[in-house]
Structures are given as structure tokens and as C-alpha cells.
């Protein structure tokens, strides 16, 4: 069997041994169900996932499936491997930018204030320009914050890429048309409180107003440090604007990653990128499912 979770087995097995007082429980002569060792291990997994702030609802779903699977004689590493695989499957296959379709490909970034949308745009744009030699352009519709526009302009200057400021869907389409020969057009939008209906409507009109001749996709940028209840409210707000893929920022500012799984399962949106610092373009990567799952199970990346 491929040892996908060695980094976790040692930690969890040690906890299991301590919980049993260092002794192996006696097996019944004719076992009819999971042994006390196996059930103790499931309890440890339960505790570990909760400690990493996976919602109790999802922990119960996953471990409920595992308890049905357990048979007498199953080793703890078999149980852990099955939990690992179930978590991997629940996260799904992360997706990068979809460059299919006619140029230019328009990429919207939406999300609340303070999550790092503008920096995330710069990181992705830098990757595609430098690593893949794509022509990139920027549009900002974040006219509420002068600092955001200035920040994006700095990145545009560094990448020697054009940038436009737009105030309406008409101006947006004019700007996109101007960049018709570019591969990627990145659109920065204003962050807003999920309670602000007016700004929400502005973003919706902008995204839905893109001329259908252009291919486009939307990324919801969320901070991994945001409280679960607030994340649910944010997702509920933005899902009324558009379908989206998920980007999680600030992974370097938290030690628990349960909300990444919680929001993936709650939103049923595809995962895309994670960021773990301010350095452009380095501190970004495609969502590393195996690394995140290992951390959820108490291991190291």
C-alpha cells in the first residue's frame, strides 16, 4: 500500500497507545464488530478533526462512513488511510485558470475587504506572464479605495502591463475590447460587507454585464483566518452574484485548516489557489490537497 499518510500515523498511533494505557485490548474470541482499539482510534480522529476546526457536521459524516466500513482486524493505518482518501475526494480536483475559449479570457476576483484580492491578482498575473509568457492586462472596478487602484497600478507597471479603471459595465466592455489581443484580463472588484446590498448589486451587474462573446470566470477570494460563521455568510452573499471558484489566502496566518474543507463542502465550489504570504509572485500555489489533508489529520506538511 502506498504510504500516503506516514507523517500522521506516528502521531495518531502514539495518541492511541496513550489512550489505551500502553496496553493492547484483548480481542474477543469471535469478533463481531470493531475492536476497542479501532473505536478508540476513530475517536482520536474525531478529536483531531474537531481540533483543526472541521465542522462537527462534516466530521460526523466522514467518520460515520468509516465506522460502517470497519471490520474486525482492520489496522489503524488502514482506517487512517480510508479517512485520508475520503477527505481527498471531498476536496476534489483543484483547478487553475481555464484558458479555453477565445481571447481575451476575463478573470474576475470578488470577495470581502482585507482578504488580499489585489495581491492575489498580482501573483497569478505574474506567474502567467513570466512562467507561461501570456499577455496580461488589468482592469480595476474598485473605485471605492484609491489605495487599491494605486496598488494594482504598481503591479501593472512592474509587469509592463496595461491597466484601465472602469465605473460601469459599459466601460468594462470597452476596456475588454481594447485588450482583445491579450490572453488574460484580470478584473479587480471592490470588497464590501456582505450586508451591503448596493455594492453587491454593483458587482453583480458588472459580472453579468460582460459581453457573452468574451470567456470569463469568477474567483471568490477568502481569508483562511475568517471565522466559520462569517465565511458562511460571505459565501451566501457572493453565490447570489455568480458561480465561482475558491481561492484561500493567508494560510500562513492560521494553524487550523478546517474551514477550507468546511467551505468547500458548504459551497460545492471548485478549489483553485492558496496563498501563504505577501511575496509576489512566490507565495501562491495551486491548492495542495494532500498537504492540507495531512495537516487536518494532525501531521506536518
Where are these regions (language model features)?
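Hydrophobic anchor at the beta1->P-loop junction of P-loop NTPases
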Residues: 107-109
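Conserved beta-strand/loop subsegment of P-loop NTPase cores
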Residues: 135-137, 213-222, 239-254, 258-261, ...
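Switch II (G3) loop of P-loop NTPases
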Residues: 112, 136-147, 158-172, 179-202
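Conserved lysine of the Walker
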Residues: 117
Amino acid at each position: 500500500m502506498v504510504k500516503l499518510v506516514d507523517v500522521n500515523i506516528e502521531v495518531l498511533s502514539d495518541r492511541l497507545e496513550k489512550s489505551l494505557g500502553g496496553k493492547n485490548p484483548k480481542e474477543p474470541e469471535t469478533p463481531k464488530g470493531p475492536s476497542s482499539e479501532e473505536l478508540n482510534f476513530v475517536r482520536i480522529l474525531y478529536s483531531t478533526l474537531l481540533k483543526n476546526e472541521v465542522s462537527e457536521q462534516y466530521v460526523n459524516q466522514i467518520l460515520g462512513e468509516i465506522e460502517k466500513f470497519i471490520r474486525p482486524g482492520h489496522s489503524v493505518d488502514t482506517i487512517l488511510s480510508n479517512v485520508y482518501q475520503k477527505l481527498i475526494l471531498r476536496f476534489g480536483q483543484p483547478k487553475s485558470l481555464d484558458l479555453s475559449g477565445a481571447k481575451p479570457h476575463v478573470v474576475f476576483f470578488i470577495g470581502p475587504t482585507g482578504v488580499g484580492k489585489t495581491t492575489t491578482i498580482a501573483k497569478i498575473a505574474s506567474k502567467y506572464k513570466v512562467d507561461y509568457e501570456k499577455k496580461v492586462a488589468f482592469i480595476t472596478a474598485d473605485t471605492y479605495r484609491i489605495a487599491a487602484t494605486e496598488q494594482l497600478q504598481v503591479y501593472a507597471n512592474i509587469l509592463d502591463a496595461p491597466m484601465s479603471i472602469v465605473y460601469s459595465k459599459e466601460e468594462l466592455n470597452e476596456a475588454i475590447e481594447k485588450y482583445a489581443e491579450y490572453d488574460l484580463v484580470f478584473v479587480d472588484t471592490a470588497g464590501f460587507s456582505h450586508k451591503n446590498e448596493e455594492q453587491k448589486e454593483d458587482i453583480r451587474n458588472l459580472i453579468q454585464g460582460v459581453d457573452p462573446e468574451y470567456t470569463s470566470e469568477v474567483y471568490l477570494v477568502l481569508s483562511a483566518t475568517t471565522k466559520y460563521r462569517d465565511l458562511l455568510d460571505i459565501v451566501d452573499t457572493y453565490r447570489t452574484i455568480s458561480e465561482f471558484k475558491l481561492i484561500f489566502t493567508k494560510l500562513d496566518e492560521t494553524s487550523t485548516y478546517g474551514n477550507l474543507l468546511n467551505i468547500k463542502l458548504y459551497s460545492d465550489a471548485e478549489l483553485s489557489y492558496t496563498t501563504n504570504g505577501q511575496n509576489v509572485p512566490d507565495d501562491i500555489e495551486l491548492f495542495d490537497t494532500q498537504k492540507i489533508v495531512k495537516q487536518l489529520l494532525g501531521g506536518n506538511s
